[in-house]
């Protein structure tokens, strides 16, 4: 079992700025790992921008900004709660994997009861934000939370736990509902945009999981990276191309034009193609996978939102 003596306190980054007693809780929430926040918050940003671009009526900018802030805070809380919950359930596995054995719970810096309380608090904070949104959002939020709670059990019973992470794609219909648009009024475009988000999430997580694939196999943790170790590249590229085509369909089916095609679809294509080319093969086991995914996700999201914002401005 790892001990506190094996652990080196952070000397830089956001964790180094915290009081020493709170650092383990910051680690538990992964506040030093922005990739997860990008992946959980950016779909809501895209959802708000997409809804603004396709809405039959012009939505006021102040209304859009207000919903964007609430949904971003929701994404922050749910991601934080999900990390703490995941570590609580995975404590036995994390002790046996070199990359995770010094996390707060395995090394004894946070008690299981403390982690459970922190998880409940963060879920509670997220739930309180729903009071500021239309009641329909509670349905989408319940789906997101259910699958967030289910995720850590997936690797024990399935070779495809990454598919559970597609719950993040519910950000698209939730964003639409928050802006008083019924996602079922546009079922095919909504499904296409959601599938595009889901494809990106699964693609990045599979590539990221390759770092631990060998050790996960030894300790019995199941994942798509373990199950499809020999064809990871093909699966990742399949998800990339299908996600890009779904994004294209989601825009075309709602009449979006050249700005969407050039900036949104083009930015998505270039950003994530760059990520795959740098991260697959020998690069999949590199510690740089997270930073590559972070920069690619940021690049793709900026261009995707810019294209949708351009479409919104054209319709003003």
From Swiss-Prot:
Catalyzed reactions: 3,5-dimethylorsellinate + (2E,6E)-farnesyl diphosphate = (3R)-3-farnesyl-6-hydroxy-2,3,5-trimethyl-4-oxocyclohexa-1,5-diene-1-carboxylate + diphosphate + H(+)
Keywords assigned: Magnesium, Membrane, Transferase, Transmembrane, Transmembrane helix
Membrane topology: Multi-pass membrane protein
Gene Ontology CC entries for this record: mitochondrial inner membrane
Main localization category: membrane
Record function comment: Polyprenyl transferase; part of the gene cluster A that mediates the biosynthesis of the fungal meroterpenoid acetoxydehydroaustin. The first step of the pathway is the synthesis of 3,5-dimethylorsellinic acid by the polyketide synthase ausA. 3,5-dimethylorsellinic acid is then prenylated by the polyprenyl transferase ausN. Further epoxidation by the FAD-dependent monooxygenase ausM and cyclization by the probable terpene cyclase ausL lead to the formation of protoaustinoid A.
UniProt-recorded name of the protein: Polyprenyl transferase ausN
Provenance organism: Penicillium brasilianum
